[in-house]
């Protein structure tokens, strides 16, 4: 989709910020500033030291893309790729450096250090920056469509954002914004899955994305195929700026700036006018979507931070019954219901950097309201064929404590959740004259605990990660037993040379079936015997890092599924549905479906080097 961008800068003195990169360099474990670190432009003589507070400023660049590196004796160096310098505002780059195992007289940043690699997830992770997202062909400024182009990722149909990872199902993915879970990231979301036709997240807010297709950290649960960690920018600290955007299908406004000396914000609203376009070209359905997003970050001091963010949407689709001339139009009008759906996620994360480690406290709430209805011949005076109303509410608390040392690091924590699900369902459109007519009002209480340890050996050539997690839900006897959901995770990474690694991972992961399945109560029975779905992952691979800011990796994977709900009315596994609109899982099911997926991935990723960048991948599943 081609878009026309109109920029409304809400300041008058923006020229003074032209061609500047500024930011801070801090210790990853303590958040203390690192004075005297050298920040430089890769391939350029431009450099600057950090001051006593860890701040730096680089000047003298013309607008364009730059790689920014930082080095300091006693710490591992880092590089931030593709930092965009413009005349509109200063580019902001912040670095967190980890203490090095070996203290050398001179710091040399290896190509491997330039790429993000975590010891607990040495395989099956792709990290992409904002410029890679914005320039993605066909991505349309939509993070899910960009992710669909990564290794191991497939999509269902072209007009939807479903993520099918390494042969899994579209309902096996989890999403986090700055560490806060966001269950819905798409408009017109499929209840019981995660896909939809249009993304909700404003990509102008994104700093970078880490996408895991295996090797999940122990603090991440309830996922079988992928974890998407979306890291957001902070608002501007100097003045307020904004972008007013008119596209082919929507209009939006984005603002960011300071609320006070210690508080910044990002905020956006968006509304589509697809209904006018669809009506003009004669389509029999008229969708409209609206969304908002904001983030507020407050720094009490260097050791205490609070982040509050929210994302929400309101989506409506009505029928255009005047467009009924062709057989195709009449067919769509005959089966397509009308939709009314809204959802929001809101969360707060408090971070404390202390002498004993880093503590995160996360509170969040999610609510989905989903309604759809259908009348015979689309006439409200005739019989009602479908009347569906449902709500999902999740209230979550998570506490995690992390200790980082040069030779090892650890994390422990736990989570508590309350989930509410209610529905009033009437549907007489089903095959064989079956009528679905039931009500559910359920509350589920959940808890989880997790621990992870990472050790570095043989002068940092060998990294070992050991993790364990368990989840419980008060649904039935099986889900209440924590031993039934023990989730061990093991990862190994060994440097054969400075820039060549051998990596492997094993993990057992659990995910609760959707509330639509847990809460089903029909004349044919209920789903009280369902339990957690299990998936075991085996991954092995090797990565070669090249001096021209590139890496080549090859990975083999094997996934084994068990206890997947088998939908009795449709005679199909729940894993194979979810790539369409509406609701999935609201029928009688048994936890008897098993499966497997295996394949091979070959990836070449080129970060910015002499104007060249890109990614190429081959996936065999």
Predicted features along the sequence, with ranges:
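Periplasm-facing N-terminal accessory domains of Gram-negative outer-membrane beta-barrel systems
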Residues: 16-106
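Outer-membrane beta-barrel translocator domains and adjoining extracellular loop/strand segments
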Residues: 278-283, 313, 318-327, 363, ...
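Face-selective signature of the C-terminal outer-membrane beta-barrel domain
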Residues: 297-315, 336-479, 488, 546, ...
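Gram-negative outer-membrane beta-barrel transporters
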Residues: 457-458, 584-621
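Predominantly transmembrane beta-strands of Gram-negative outer membrane beta-barrel pores used
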Residues: 174, 208-219, 225-233, 240-284, ...
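Periplasmic N-terminal accessory/gating domains of Gram-negative outer-membrane beta-barrel systems
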Residues: 76, 83-87, 91-92, 108-217, ...
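Surface-exposed extracellular loop regions of Gram-negative outer-membrane beta-barrel proteins
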Residues: 185-186, 192, 322-325, 369, ...
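Hydrophobic, lipid-facing positions within transmembrane beta-strands of outer-membrane proteins
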Residues: 161, 224-226, 240, 246-253, ...
């Amino acid at each position: 989709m081609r878009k026309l961008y109109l920029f409304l800068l809400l300041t008058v003195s923006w020229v003074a910020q032209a061609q500047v990169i500024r930011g801070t360099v801090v210790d990853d474990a303590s958040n203390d500033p690192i004075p005297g670190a050298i920040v430089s432009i890769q391939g350029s003589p431009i450099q600057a030291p950090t001051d006593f507070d860890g701040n730096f400023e680089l000047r003298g660049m013309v607008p364009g893309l730059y790689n920014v590196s930082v080095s300091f004796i006693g710490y591992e160096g880092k590089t931030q790729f593709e930092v965009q310098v413009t005349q509109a505002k200063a580019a902001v780059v912040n670095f967190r450096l980890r203490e090095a195992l070996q203290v050398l007289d001179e710091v040399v940043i290896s190509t491997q250090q330039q790429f993000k690699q975590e010891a607990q997830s040495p395989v099956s992770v792709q990290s992409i920056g904002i410029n890679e997202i914005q320039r993605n062909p066909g991505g349309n400024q939509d993070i899910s469509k960009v992710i669909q182009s990564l290794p191991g990722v497939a999509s269902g149909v072209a007009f939807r954002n479903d993520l099918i990872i390494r042969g899994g199902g579209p309902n096996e993915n989890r999403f986090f914004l700055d560490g806060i879970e966001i269950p819905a990231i798409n408009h017109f979301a499929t209840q019981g899955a995660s896909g939809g036709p249009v993304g909700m997240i404003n990509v102008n807010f994104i700093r970078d994305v880490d996408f895991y297709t295996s090797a999940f950290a122990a603090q991440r649960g309830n996922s079988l195929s992928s974890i998407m960690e979306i890291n957001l920018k902070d608002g501007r600290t100097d003045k307020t700026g904004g972008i007013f955007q008119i596209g082919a299908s929507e209009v939006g406004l984005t603002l960011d700036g300071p609320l006070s000396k210690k508080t910044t914000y990002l905020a956006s609203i968006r509304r589509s006018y697809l209904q006018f376009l669809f009506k003009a070209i004669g389509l029999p359905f008229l969708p409209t979507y609206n969304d908002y997003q904001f983030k507020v970050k407050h720094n009490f001091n260097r050791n205490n931070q609070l982040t509050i963010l929210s994302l929400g949407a309101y989506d409506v689709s009505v029928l255009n019954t005047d467009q009924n001339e062709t057989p195709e139009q009449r067919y769509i009008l005959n089966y397509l219901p009308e939709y009314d759906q809204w959802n929001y996620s809101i969360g707060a994360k408090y971070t404390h950097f202390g002498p004993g480690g880093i503590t995160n406290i996360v509170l969040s709430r999610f609510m989905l309201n989903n309604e759809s209805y259908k009348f015979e011949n689309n006439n409200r005076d005739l019989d009602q064929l479908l009347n569906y109303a449902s709500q999902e509410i999740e209230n979550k608390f998570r506490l995690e404590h992390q200790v980082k040392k040069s030779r090892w690091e650890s994390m422990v924590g736990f989570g508590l959740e309350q989930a509410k699900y209610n529905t009033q369902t009437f549907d007489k459109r089903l095959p064989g004259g079956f009528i679905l007519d039931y009500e559910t009002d359920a509350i589920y209480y959940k808890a989880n605990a997790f621990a992870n340890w990472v050790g570095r050996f043989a002068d940092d050539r060998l990294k070992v990660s050991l993790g364990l997690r368990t989840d419980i839900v008060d649904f039935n006897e099986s889900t209440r037993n924590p031993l039934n959901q023990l989730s061990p995770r093991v990862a190994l990474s060994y440097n054969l040379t400075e820039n060549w690694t051998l990596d492997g991972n094993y993990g057992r992961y659990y995910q609760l079936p959707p509330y639509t399945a847990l809460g089903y109560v029909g004349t044919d029975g209920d789903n009280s015997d369902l339990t957690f779905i299990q998936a075991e992952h085996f991954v092995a691979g090797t990565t070669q890092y090249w001096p021209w800011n590139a890496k080549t990796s090859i990975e083999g994977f094997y996934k084994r599924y068990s206890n997947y709900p088998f939908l009795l009315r449709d005679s199909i596994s729940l894993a194979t549905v979810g790539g369409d609109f509406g609701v999935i899982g609201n029928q009688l099911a048994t936890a008897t479906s098993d499966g497997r997926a295996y394949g091979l991935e070959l990836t070449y990723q080129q970060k910015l080097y002499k104007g060249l960048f890109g990614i190429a991948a081959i996936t065999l599943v």
